[in-house]
């Protein structure tokens, strides 16, 4: 992506700040205020709004990873990585040493239809597609207009890590783990670091393939298949 002229940099930075502000507000309201029933539509609408911000700021569909030219490449990479993820998760469930990592009380009481909703709609569309649009699409594209690749990836990935603070706190509460303050802080900090690193890898995948489809499929497969694995472990145990 071409860098903008110095005279336009401050305008793009303003759009970046607006996108970050939208994400921050959405993160708080989505985790603390809005009912779960509106999770998917709220995220879809926010994603569309962010794409609108990027387009107004001068980003093209190709800049966002949404162009048709690289879609086939993104699809191939995404499906290949999803297959590797599936094999890894299956091995994790089968091995006694790692099986316990899949215990998650949030899926324990799900019915078949609720599980299908989580794995086929809520996670792929409400989580994976939205977060990839936001962090590997809009933010990365706008950051690349004002800085080089490494800082752009670093900022996008750091924000992706911070994005997971509130969801991690909710997960800790639901599973009644890391009850002490120090343990909770450590768990949240660990989650931020892990997701930031994951975000950097997804950025690399996005840039390598030229398509947002690859990180979307990777993200969706990882989260959806992990949910199915957790459900299987809960039922079996």
Residue ranges and their predicted role:
Residues 5-59, 73, 77, 109-118:
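Alpha-helical transmembrane segments in multi-pass membrane proteins
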Residues 29-30, 57-58, 96-97, 164, ...:
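Short helix-capping/hinge motifs at transmembrane helix termini and TM-loop junctions
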Residues 32-39, 61-128, 144-145, 174-183, ...:
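Juxtamembrane helix-loop-helix connectors linking adjacent transmembrane helices
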Residues 58-63, 135:
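C-terminal ends of transmembrane helices
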């Amino acid at each position: 992506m071409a860098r903008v002229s110095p005279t336009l940099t401050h305008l793009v930075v303003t759009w970046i700040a607006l996108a970050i502000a939208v994400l921050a507000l959405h993160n708080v309201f989505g985790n603390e205020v809005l009912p779960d029933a509106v999770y998917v539509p709220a995220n879809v609408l926010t994603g569309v709004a962010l794409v609108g911000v990027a387009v107004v700021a001068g980003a093209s569909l190709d800049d966002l990873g949404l162009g048709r030219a690289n879609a086939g490449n993104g699809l191939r990479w995404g499906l290949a990585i999803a297959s590797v993820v599936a094999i890894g998760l299956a091995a994790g469930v089968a091995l006694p040493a790692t099986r316990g990592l899949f215990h998650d009380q949030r899926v324990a009481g799900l019915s078949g239809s609720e599980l299908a909703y989580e794995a086929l709609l809520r996670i792929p569309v409400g989580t994976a597609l939205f977060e990839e649009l936001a962090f590997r699409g809009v933010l990365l594209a706008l950051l690349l207009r004002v800085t080089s690749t490494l800082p752009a990836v670093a900022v996008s990935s750091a924000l992706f890590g911070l994005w997971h603070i509130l969801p991690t706190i909710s997960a800790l509460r639901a599973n009644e783990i890391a009850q002490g303050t120090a343990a909770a802080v450590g768990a949240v900090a660990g989650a931020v670091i892990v997701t930031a690193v994951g975000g950097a890898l997804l950025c690399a995948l996005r840039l390598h393939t030229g398509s947002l489809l690859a990180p979307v499929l990777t993200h969706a497969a990882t989260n959806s298949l992990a949910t199915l694995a957790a459900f299987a472990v809960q039922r079996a145990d």
